[in-house]
């Protein structure tokens, strides 16, 4: 491996809906077998992956079983109940203590000219889950009428004016490339992928991570 553990300070996991969640989860789990970032941040689906990577015992089988038991109870637009139920079950009661200072959740501050903001401290598990919901908040889709979440008054960072500039502050970025753009890409992101496809995405993420961690260019800030 060409990269030493102490060289990685800040890791960012980008969003991209359900496909990116499974891919990035596989990528991140494999990466942490070789490299230990001091700080992990994420936005949208990437924020969910980021918090799960703080839990060494979190495994693909357990997350998939919980996710697919929950997703059957939710319709296409009920993303918030899915996030709250899944994260409520898999995150420990003291997750806020584990995460404080080690995890960053990136939001789009709708009331501040759509600038990115990053939250790094929480007082409870419930508050952290509220923040995860805000990071995944898509106007009019989450609850049908609001343009931002109720607790943080924010939305998915993909709607931020300065997301690209904000991500430059990170040493490495995990992202899933996509073939389509526009409305097709949006639809692909919000529809849960079948379990078999999720397994494939996790596997491909693991393979990509194993390759990148051994062939990374020292001048690059992306694992893709």
Please name every model-derived segment:
Residues 1-43, 51-224:
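Patatin-like phospholipase
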